[in-house]
Amino acid sequence: MSAGPGGPQGGMQPPREQSKRLQQTQAQVDEVVDIMRVNVEKVLDRDQKISQLDDRAEALQAGASQFEASAGKLKRKYWWKNCKMMLILGAIIGVIVIIIIVWVVTSQDSGGDDSGSKTPATAGTSPKPVESGVQGGGGRQQRPHSQLVERRNVLRRTEDHIGCRPHIHSFIHIFMICLV
C-alpha cells in the first residue's frame, strides 16, 4: 500500500499530533487568561485601595486645615489674654510705685513738723536745711552723703511715727537710696 498525497508521509501531520498541539496551545491560552483574570482582579483591588487612600488623604487634609485654623484662633486668644495680663500687671505696679512715692513725699513733708517723735540718734541734732544747691560762699553743692543722711533721718522719724515693720523699713530704705 502506497501512501497517497494525504498519507502520513505527505506534507500533513496526523490528526493526533494536531489535536495535541491544539490542546497545548489551548492550555497555554487558558493559563494566560487565568493569569490575566488574576491581574485584572488585582488591578481592580488596587484601584479600590487607592480610591480609599485618596479619600482618607482628603479627610486628613480637611482635618489638618481645621486644626490649623483652630490653633491660630487659640494662639490669638491667648496672646490677647497675655497682653491683658501684662497691662493689668503694669497698671498694678504703676499704682504701687505711685502710692510709695506719694507716701514717701508726704511722710517727708510731715516728718519735719513732728518734733516729739525723734529717735535718740536724731534727738540732739537739728535737721539741716536743704538749700538750693549752694552752701556757704564756696559755690559748692551739698554733698550727696549729707542728703542721704537727711533722708535717712526723715525715714527714721516716719518709721517711728507709723510703726513700720523691719522688712518694710528695708524696702523703704532701699527705695530712698535709689531716689538719691
Curated annotation (Swiss-Prot):
GO cellular component: neuron projection; synaptic vesicle membrane
Compartment(s) of residence: Cytoplasmic vesicle, Secretory vesicle, Synaptic vesicle membrane; Synapse, Synaptosome
Entries under InterPro entries matching the protein: Synaptobrevin-like, Synaptobrevin/VAMP, V_SNARE_CC
One GO term of the biological process aspect: vesicle-mediated transport
Keywords associated with the record: Coiled coil, Cytoplasmic vesicle, Membrane, Synapse, Synaptosome, Transmembrane, Transmembrane helix
Role, per record: Intrinsic membrane protein of small synaptic vesicles.
Protein name, as recorded: Synaptobrevin
Organism: Aplysia californica (California sea hare)
Organism lineage: Eukaryota, Metazoa, Spiralia, Lophotrochozoa, Mollusca
